[in-house]
Amino acid sequence: MDRNFLRLAVFATGPEHAADDAELFGAVAAQVEGHGRIGGVGAVQDDLAGQQVRHDRVHNLYGGSMTRAAGEAFADLRPGRRTLLYSRSSIIGSHRYGGIWLGDNHSSWEQLLANIQMMPSVQMCGFLYTGADLCGFAGDTTPDLALRWLEFGLFTPLMRNHAAAGTREQEYFRFADQLPALREMLRLRYALLPYLYSEFMKSALENTGYFRPLGFDWPADPEAREVQDQLLLGDGVMLAPMYTQNAAGRHVYLPGPMQLYRLRSAEDYDTEALPAGHHYVHCALNEVLLFVRPGHAVPLAKPAACTAALDEQPIALLACPDADGHAAYRMYTDDGETMDPEHDGHWTVLDASH
C-alpha cells in the first residue's frame, strides 16, 4: 500500500479538518504493535505523527476517508449539483458523502437470500444508496439465477450487474432463453422509479426507512418479527422475493390484508386481494410478487431507456383501497440535478380512491 495514497485519502479533506484527522489517525496508530510487514500486510506511513500504521489496523477508515475526500472535492468543484459516488469500503457516517455496494458476493441462491436479508441492516446504518452485485460477483451464474436476482435487484436503490474476471459473462443480453423476461424486468425498474425515488427521498428527509423488516411495522405480531425473507419497501409495499432454484411459488406471511400484484411487466399483471395470514403464492419465473397495503397506491410511469427520457405522465396506479375505498400516494419529483430536496413543490398527491 503506497503511503502517499493513504495520506491523500485520509488527509485530503481540507485544512479545517486537519486537526480532527490527525487526532483520529493518531488514535489508530497508537494501537499498532510493531512496524513493517506483519502477516503479509503492508505498512503505511502517517507523515504527521512520524509513525508507521499497518493497514489491517486502519481497515474501513481508509475507504471511508477516500469517500469523504472525494465527496468534499466534488462539492467544491460542482457546488449545488449532485454527484453519484459510492464505494465498497466505508465506515459509519460515510453515507453523508456517498453510498456503498455490498462487496464480493457469490453467484448462488444462498447469496441472493443473503442480499435480501442484508438490505434493512445496511440501511439502518445510514446507507440508503446501496445494493449487491446482481447475478453474483464470484463464480458462474445461471440464466434462472440472473433473472430472479434482477427481480429483486430492480427494487434496490443501486441496481448493478457486476462480475469478477474469469467468470461466466453475465450481461443480460447473453441469456437468450430469458432475454424477453430480463428485458421486461429492466423496463419495470424504470416504470417503478416514481415510487422507488419517492420512497428513497422520504427515507432521507423523513427517516421513514426504505427497506424495513415486517416487525418494524407490526412489532406486536410475533410471526411478523420472525420473517426474514420478506421486506417492506416504503410505506405502501411489501416484497416477497423468490430465492429458491426451480421454485414455482413460495410461502408468504401477511400481517394484514393486502392486494397482490403478480407483475410480468409494467403493463402485464394480474391481481387478487389476500386476507391476513399464511399463504402459498404461485410465481412463475418471469413474475414479481408485489403486495400493496390498504390505503396505498404505487405509481407506474411509462418505461424509458434512461431516466432523462422517463415520462411520468400519464401515470398508472397499482392500488389497494382501504375499507372506505380510499387509496392515495404522495409522490416526490425534482429535476434530478440540483441540491434542493426540501422544496414544497417537489410533492404531488395522487388519488386512486374509488
Place the predicted regions along the sequence by residue.
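Generic alpha-helical propensity signal that fires on short helical segments
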Residues: 23, 45, 101-105, 167, ...
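Intrinsically disordered, low-complexity regions of eukaryotic proteins
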Residues: 4, 18, 22-25, 35, ...
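Accessory, solvent-exposed terminal regions and/or long lumenal/extracellular loops of proteins
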Residues: 290-354
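Intrinsic low-complexity, disordered N-terminal segments enriched in polar/charged/small residues
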Residues: 14-21, 29-33, 45
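Catalytic-domain carbohydrate-binding cleft regions of carbohydrate-active enzymes
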Residues: 1-7, 26, 30, 37-287
